[in-house]
Regions:
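Conserved N-terminal Rossmann-fold NAD(P)-binding element of oxidoreductases
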Residues: 136-139
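Hydrophobic/small residue at the entry helix of a nucleotide-binding pocket
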Residues: 143
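Rossmann-like adenosine-cofactor binding region
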Residues: 166-261
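An N-terminal-biased, well-structured beta-alpha scaffold segment characteristic
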Residues: 1-82, 207
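Phosphate-binding beta-alpha-beta segment of Rossmann-like dinucleotide-binding domains, i.e.
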Residues: 81, 86-134, 146, 154, ...
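A short, aliphatic-rich alpha-helical micro-motif
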Residues: 33-35, 52-55, 130, 185-189, ...
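NAD(P)-binding Rossmann-fold cofactor-contacting core
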Residues: 154-171
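C-terminal helix-to-coil terminal segments
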Residues: 84-97, 111, 252-306
Length: 306
């Protein structure tokens, strides 16, 4: 059996471990002349460059990312190819990034950095707390669950979730799955976290009308996809100080153009789609690869099937 692995995503230590663990498998790290591979362990960007019709023995694709909005899932499934993603790999680091963005605003970190630069000692009183607040998490998958766990530790009063199904994951106080419920979350929450996949239903989910529902002290943090928020409506909302601020790890487009007004707004904190960054990322991808590869070889159900 021959399997392609995107070597750079495994790390220089883990890739040899993979070869040692499965000595009967021929692992390749390029696809030139290897159209007979039976599995691809691959980044979305690499996959999108391939003509899958050439890979007549292909049975499984393991994406090395959680998001798959840029992958033609229907086409892959039409060819009876199994496809899985890496949804749990990035959840911890993304959840920590969300907390960092909230604390950036709550503890006035930009202001105090400016004070340091100017050698000024000028404290602010009555800085907001996460404690006793209401949090709305749009998306209660692996990222949402890690977020809820952390917000509980901060002593929040309520955690609302918005998701398709009605089941209530641990640490959530209430789950909504319709438009009325979404409006309740937006009207009630001090912190709105977007952790939804991008689909035709979630594109521009947070539009101008829904931004108007947010409390004046609300913070909105997007670690999902930029297109879930109507960016022009958000810019208008922020310029008019209708909400306290926005922490954005994702924008439309990416990279964010230098002439975008978002760069100059004092109530925005932008990071370059880097919330998942972690020294443990490659190890977690390696562990996921090991687990699903074992399942694939033994004809067991794969984890994180799309």
């Amino acid at each position: 059996m021959k399997i392609f692995v995107e070597k750079r995503m495994m790390g220089r230590i883990n890739y040899p471990k993979l070869i040692k663990k499965f000595p009967k498998i021929e692992f390749v790290d390029n696809l030139d002349g290897h159209e007979d591979v039976e599995a691809l362990i691959i980044m979305n960007s690499t996959l999108n460059k391939l003509d899958l019709d050439k890979f007549i023995r292909l049975r499984w694709i393991q994406l090395l990312m959680a998001g798959y909005d840029n992958v033609d899932i229907n086409y892959i499934k039409s060819k009876r190819i199994l496809i899985t993603n890496a949804r749990d790999v990035f959840s911890i680091s993304i959840a920590e990034d969300v907390i960092a963005k909230i604390l950036y605003f709550n503890r006035n970190m930009k202001y105090y950095q400016d004070c340091m630069n100017d050698k000024v000692w000028n404290p602010i009183s009555k800085e907001p707390e996460i404690f006793n607040s209401t949090v709305g998490i749009l998306g209660s998958g692996s990222i949402g669950k890690e977020l809820a766990k952390r917000f509980k530790a901060f002593g929040v009063e309520q955690i609302f979730g918005y998701k398709k199904s009605k089941d209530k994951p641990e640490n959530f106080d209430q789950i909504f799955n319709d438009e009325e419920g979404l409006e309740t979350i937006l009207k009630s929450s001090d912190y709105i976290i977007i952790a939804l996949p991008l689909t035709k239903d979630t594109k521009n989910l947070i539009n101008s009308e829904r931004l108007q529902l947010l409390k004046p002290n609300a913070l909105i943090v997007n670690v999902a996809r930029g297109e879930i928020i109507d960016q022009e409506a958000l810019i208008k909302c922020l310029k008019q100080k209708q909400i306290r601020g926005a922490g954005l790890d994702v924008t439309t487009p990416e990279p964010l153009p230098k002439d975008s007004e978002l760069w100059s707004l004092d109530n925005v904190y932008i990071t370059p789609h880097n919330a998942s960054s972690s020294p443990y990322m490659k190890d977690r991808l390696f562990e996921l690869t090991l687990m699903n590869l074992e399942r694939f070889l033994n004809n067991h159900k794969l984890k994180y099937l799309i």
